[in-house]
Design a protein with these regions (language model features):
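Nucleotidyl polymerases of mobile genetic elements and RNA viruses
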Residues: 1-206
Length: 206
């Protein structure tokens, strides 16, 4: 997993911890505040994250990451022929096939979810400018622990790119960002031309 999942995703990857995310966010806030850096943090709320994992998308993602067909087939067995029923007005409806979601209690749940989300995170790393600290060449774009994803932005352009990428990913994977529950924080000295529009998160800047 550590060879496939980028180091900024710490969920269910050996030698990584939620503590890494906490320290990173803390340091970004402290450094941005003390140096007056133009930094924005957007915490994405994934709507019913684990329940919206599309099985077909997950299998194809695993293939693209180089997992063998034998391993994929074994995992598919665990998720094949799953049915569910709904109870409506005291009566059970006819069973229907379940084609989404990673199973609660499954030992592979965390790893499968991290794999399903990694294509989105890869695209964000490539396209969002993020934060570059003085003295460092590499930019920091995000911090993720499972579906808890915080994206670092530099200006309105980053916000525009972020929204477009999440919309395209939703169309491909069935994942969905709930912008009404997402949060954002502006730190440092923002210049008027580059300040993100507050309307994109329904005035949820705080």
């Amino acid at each position: 997993m550590e060879q496939v999942i980028h180091r900024d995703q710490t969920y269910c990857v050996p030698s990584r911890s939620l503590v890494d995310n906490i320290y990173l966010i803390r340091d970004v806030l402290e450094v941005s505040g003390s140096l007056g850096l133009q930094t924005g943090l957007i915490s994405l709320d994934q709507e019913k994250a684990f329940d919206r994992v599309e099985h077909g998308f997950l299998w194809e993602t695993m293939r693209r990451f180089g997992f063998g067909e034998g391993l994929i087939a074994k995992i598919q067995v665990l998720y094949s022929d799953i049915e569910s029923v709904l109870k409506i007005n005291g009566s059970l409806c006819a069973p229907f096939r379940v084609c989404r979601g990673v199973r609660q209690g499954c030992a592979l749940l965390g790893m499968l979810y991290a794999l399903s989300l990694e294509p989105l995170l890869q695209k964000l790393r490539l396209c969002v400018y993020g934060l570059v600290l003085p003295g460092f060449r590499n930019n920091m774009v995000l911090s993720a622990y499972a579906d808890d994803v915080v994206v670092f932005i530099k200006d309105q352009q980053d916000v525009t790119v972020l929204t477009k990428i999440t919309e395209k990913f939703s169309a491909l994977s069935a994942a969905r960002v709930n912008w009404g529950k997402s949060e954002a924080l502006a730190v440092g000295e923002w210049s008027a031309p580059s300040s993100p529009s507050r309307s994109f998160l329904e005035e949820r800047w705080f």
